[in-house]
A protein has these predicted regions:
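Active-site loop segments of alpha/beta catalytic cores
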Residues: 1-193
Length: 193
């Protein structure tokens, strides 16, 4: 997503450090960069679709850094622009606005085909808040546990979403220290459900 790309562009260290100062001291530059990112991403997305992509996922890994006042301008608006463009290509779009608290508002404003949730989201609450398909949610740290706990947590997610369109996935990336055998076990658990 444009916002997350911008965060990486303006922060030399951790995205959480000095972001607010950069954000407020360089507002016009930030808006110019966001417009350029929108154009660049649309070219990139078009090439992806031309080369066989059947669905596009927009990752906004740093959306949660923004307060409620700034979310519409820096997350909702630029992401909506991309979603509209992707849908005009007749391709469904998944949005992953990690760390935001207002998934219902996001879905109603941005209108993705699917919403991907992070591991801090209450799966029962999101199920009541949104009517579109949901992806993800399970904490990747559970893969560092034992098979019994992993199966129990995976089954909990599958049970919660059994009557709602759901794509099983983690609520963020696989941790580097994850045993590949645990990933195999997770896949088997989901397939056997």
């Amino acid at each position: 997503a444009p916002w997350t790309l911008l965060v990486y562009m303006i922060n030399k260290k951790s995205p959480k450090q000095n972001l607010r100062a950069d954000f407020y001291n360089n507002g016009s530059l930030i808006n110019q960069i966001m417009k350029l990112l929108d154009k660049f991403l649309k070219v990139h997305i078009k090439k992806q679709v031309e080369n066989g992509a059947q669905i596009i996922q927009i990752f906004d890994s740093w959306a949660g850094l923004l307060n409620d006042k700034d979310l519409p301008n820096y997350v909702y608006k630029p992401t909506s622009s991309l979603v509209e463009y992707i849908k005009s290509l007749d391709v469904p779009v998944i949005c992953f606005p990690r760390g935001i608290k207002k998934y219902k508002d996001f879905c109603e404003t941005v209108k993705p085909s699917v919403i991907c949730i992070d591991y801090e989201v209450d799966p029962i609450k999101i199920l009541n808040d949104v009517k579109i398909p949901i992806q993800g949610g399970m904490d990747p740290k559970i893969l560092l546990s034992d098979k019994n706990n992993l199966k129990k947590e995976a089954t909990r997610y599958l049970d919660i979403f059994k009557n709602h369109p759901y794509i099983f996935n983690l609520g963020h990336g696989v941790l580097p220290e994850t045993d590949p055998n645990m990933m195999d076990y997770l896949v088997k658990t989901v397939k056997d459900y």
